[in-house]
Amino acid sequence: MLQVHRTGLGRLGVSLSKGLHHKAVLAVRREDVNAWERRAPLAPKHIKGITNLGYKVLIQPSNRRAIHDKDYVKAGGILQEDISEACLILGVKRPPEEKLMSRKTYAFFSHTIKAQEANMGLLDEILKQEIRLIDYEKMVDHRGVRVVAFGQWAGVAGMINILHGMGLRLLALGHHTPFMHIGMAHNYRNSSQAVQAVRDAGYEISLGLMPKSIGPLTFVFTGTGNVSKGAQAIFNELPCEYVEPHELKEVSQTGDLRKVYGTVLSRHHHLVRKTDAVYDPAEYDKHPERYISRFNTDIAPYTTCLINGIYWEQNTPRLLTRQDAQSLLAPGKFSPAGVEGCPALPHKLVAICDISADTGGSIEFMTECTTIEHPFCMYDADQHIIHDSVEGSGILMCSIDNLPAQLPIEATECFGDMLYPYVEEMILSDATQPLESQNFSPVVRDAVITSNGTLPDKYKYIQTLRESRERAQSLSMGTRRKVLVLGSGYISEPVLEYLSRDGNIEITVGSDMKNQIEQLGKKYNINPVSMDICKQEEKLGFLVAKQDLVISLLPYVLHPLVAKACITNKVNMVTASYITPALKELEKSVEDAGITIIGELGLDPGLDHMLAMETIDKAKEVGATIESYISYCGGLPAPEHSNNPLRYKFSWSPVGVLMNVMQSATYLLDGKVVNVAGGISFLDAVTSMDFFPGLNLEGYPNRDSTKYAEIYGISSAHTLLRGTLRYKGYMKALNGFVKLGLINREALPAFRPEANPLTWKQLLCDLVGISPSSEHDVLKEAVLKKLGGDNTQLEAAEWLGLLGDEQVPQAESILDALSKHLVMKLSYGPEEKDMIVMRDSFGIRHPSGHLEHKTIDLVAYGDINGFSAMAKTVGLPTAMAAKMLLDGEIGAKGLMGPFSKEIYGPILERIKAEGIIYTTQSTIKP
């Protein structure tokens, strides 16, 4: 049975002359800050005791208060709005600053004793109005133990809530349990009703009705105070057995499913000195920084539900960090085997009830309290995000900071029992007189936080703490993190926009395009620096040395130059481009410098890697193997803007795009290596795409796909292909350019600066071997012959003006000239937008023998007069990785791509908030 400590009502502790009674007035103010705050500091029985002694008690009316106003009136209280007559005003939580009355004595939980920033405005107002504040939290006995607290009821309500939450979470994981019939604490009229629901659930557990595949449930209680005792009082109503922490591992694996197991954790169970793994309580109290917690390795892996009731102080070890959570969410080594319909738990740790509600405290990743309205959230350690659901990956979290308000009547009565013996001396407080003149007991006197417009000596440390924090914040703002962005092309804008959201990041943009950086400087708060890194390596090194991070958005051939500067100055770096062999050669130097360089963070390469690795890692977690992987990606004009012979438009230099058709490609198909030569024969490798039929797509293989068997860790795959998507007709048009000799990077005499200007007609005449003075029809016939009689390719050349008298742009080669020409002809207009299409296909063989065909589709559109789809999908993931490095979310060192969960997990989640959405679909065949 739930046992709650109560103090009997006796005569108040201070004897007064009756002549003073009429002057001393007590008021109980209504709670008006939180909608769920239905408690009061005193119950009617306490009011009756006070009024019987001749004191006047005012009760501010409140329909929200759980105990009815009429019960207070019946006990002798006077119901009225105006409480200005009172010399002592009691509440539970803080009043609004505008409702404070000067030179009164107030008693409530102020939450100011740690110089909490959120309540410093309240403290200032209290000091200004010369209010005497008695803080319940500091009412302690000679041992330092609190004599007035709601702690036990926080434990009771918190335990009821987390049992309810576990019922919901386990159901989301595929398991009906007896916990489903336990409601939230506030759904019960009193704790006795809640206890009966817990007992009913316990009876079903004792009958063996818990799912076998989830294994024995273990509950760990931290601390031995009132909070822990209250939680244990509810837990004890289940068929439970308490074990020592060192026994937890065994019972979590082989325990009896007809009971649940509990462990009460004290400091000596998990704290050890860093040097010799010994715990010395006296030393720990003085030097907690010398100790570490082994909770993450010795206790947490065998814990189903953690009930945390301890607060965290600076320099003390945390129970769990973000990194701990990531390892704990890995599939359990000792989980019972599951089958379809009766799955095993994805990991042992299912839920945490952080009754301390200490954000960023002993549970580092509990960064935000939940509420009674929204009591649960899920912490996904892989993604390092919190989402409001009981579904998906992660740990169920409950961290309500006003739990006793869920059982307001009993909490009020119990709290009032503890406060009652001190009320009379508090009523006698005269806030207009010096504190030293008051006849207070040590319990009350030492709880006075403010008096006569000052902080008593005991609490002057609050101002010191406050000033220290403000100095730290000022220093933090003064030491802004510095980022150098190299390159000012269209990809740079989403990067700058994303990083600029953090006002503590100082951004420098280096580029040889002076006009571009000037335009960027008008839109974003940046430091523009005009420079050509190829010619100003010394300036590059000087700039890099002053940064915390470098983002290179330059052509890939320049990345090694930037990387060398980063290595020399030990500065981290990210880039969206491929990790080239030249960059790979610097791998050892990167490791020796102890820095992080992450490449391939854009779209392709980038998001394609991340989506692939997420699927592959999840498959491996369940023991499945990848049999096939095919990925196609393309940047295209939106369909309505594709009306040209190439069905394509350019947002940057076409050189790379045009050269792709001249590059060979290698891929694996059904266990056989297929080699595709570049040039004219490349057209034979083009395949019609049957997904998204409305887009009329074609695809062709890209570079060497076979190397990804090792990179992705999928040597089991018999098919590996990465390719490029275009609208149908694109490759045929480019094939015509190849036939005509336009995809040629060789320098020609006719392109020298001293040569006479050349028209496209003259150039084509030369390429097809006829006189430059030939008539148009003669040229047309010769070109058609060169194209093998393909009229479609001829029409494309004519549409682009390649048979006309337009002057060829000055360039080093025909390819460079063609690129400049295509930019003029096929650039995006101001009202035109692009799109990104990506399709990943996987063949996944499960341990059961079933073959899963899984597809991932990512389609994104550019914004008219905004960022293009290409800029967003390349720039944002790059910026996110940069921010993660700055924030310490990525701990790995060396040269790497986004192949680890530490990198791809958060990025894949965060791109959704930016409107980059991907969808998945699976079909399973026997």
From Swiss-Prot:
Positions with a binding annotation for L-saccharopine: S577, Y578, D604, R703, T724, L725, R726
Subcellular location as annotated: Mitochondrion
One Gene Ontology term of the molecular function aspect: saccharopine dehydrogenase (NADP+, L-lysine-forming) activity
Group of enzyme by EC: oxidoreductase
Residues of the signal peptide: none
Biological process, per Gene Ontology: L-lysine catabolic process to acetyl-CoA via saccharopine; lysine biosynthetic process via aminoadipic acid; lysine catabolic process; negative regulation of transcription by RNA polymerase II
Cited CDD domains: LKR_SDH_like
Transit peptide: 1-27
EC id: 1.5.1.8, 1.5.1.9
Gene3D superfamilies linked: Dihydrodipicolinate Reductase, domain 2, Domain 3, Saccharopine reductase, NAD(P)-binding Rossmann-like Domain
Entry function: Bifunctional enzyme that catalyzes the first two steps in lysine degradation.
Family: In the N-terminal section; belongs to the AlaDH/PNT family. In the C-terminal section; belongs to the saccharopine dehydrogenase family.
Protein name: Alpha-aminoadipic semialdehyde synthase, mitochondrial
Source organism of the structure: Homo sapiens (Human)
